[in-house]
Amino acid sequence: MTNREKKFTLLLILIVVGAAIYYLVKYDILLIDVKDRVNLLVAFGTVGMTLMIVYIEVIRPWIQKPEIKIEFANKRPYCRHAKTTSSSRPYYCHFAVVNSGKTLTDDCEAVLERVWDSSNEKKNSEWEEWENFIPCNLKWSAENPKEDFKRACFKTIYPGERRYFCDIGRVNEKHDTFNFELSRFFLSQVNYLSRGKHKIQISVYSKNAAKVTKKFVIDWCGEWKGTQPEMEEGLKIKML
């Protein structure tokens, strides 16, 4: 039992005991006949049980609710070259989801919701949002949507310090685009970023935790590089 739970439990006990003492003092239990004494004790017991049920069903889940947060940095392990069986070495970028609450969160999904392009490369440039962009599920790392679509889209995240990684996108060797890592995508809309500065919005939803939304600025030089320092310089991603 956490300190917060202990405080709530103590508060409930004090409420019941305080109410009992108040009525005992006000009505002098010695002057009440036996039948009324029994009824009074039953009433106090009922109130106490009701408060405990409210605590168990409402207050305790609220105290112990999951709390998810997004972590990212433009360095390993969030951004790195993949080790594959082939000679190709795609460069992947992920963010991490951590549950800092007290209970697990079910059906956690990450959704790419909005995309903007920068009108120019200046610091104070305006952003032009992609029109009619349809939100898409990003893929949880190390999952293959062709083998198990549900596992690729939805994740159970347990409380603690463990980081659950979700893919943002990748750059393939000898390619000049930053491709979003989507579980499924629409053929009617673009699923990659070309050279330049862009901004994206990602939200993480779940069955029993509050939605978390973050924006990322992606500054992409348009050329895959073979070393980590070169890629960190050529593909700069900042979480706002």
What are these regions (language model features)?
Residues 99-104, 116, 208:
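Short, acidic/polar linear motifs in exposed loop/turn regions
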Residues 94-98, 111-113, 201-205:
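Residue-level recognition of well-ordered beta-strand positions that form the cores
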Residues 127-194:
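Extended, solvent-exposed segments with strong compositional bias
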Residues 58-86:
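Low-complexity, acidic Ser/Thr/Pro/Gly-rich terminal tails and inter-domain linkers that flank the onset
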Residues 85-94, 197-199:
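Short, solvent-exposed loop/turn segments enriched in Ser/Thr/Gly
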Residues 5-65:
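Membrane-embedded hydrophobic alpha-helical segments
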Residues 147, 155, 188-240:
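Acidic, serine/threonine- and proline-rich intrinsically disordered appendage/tail regions
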Residues 103-112, 121-125:
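Short, hydrophobic/aromatic beta-strand segments
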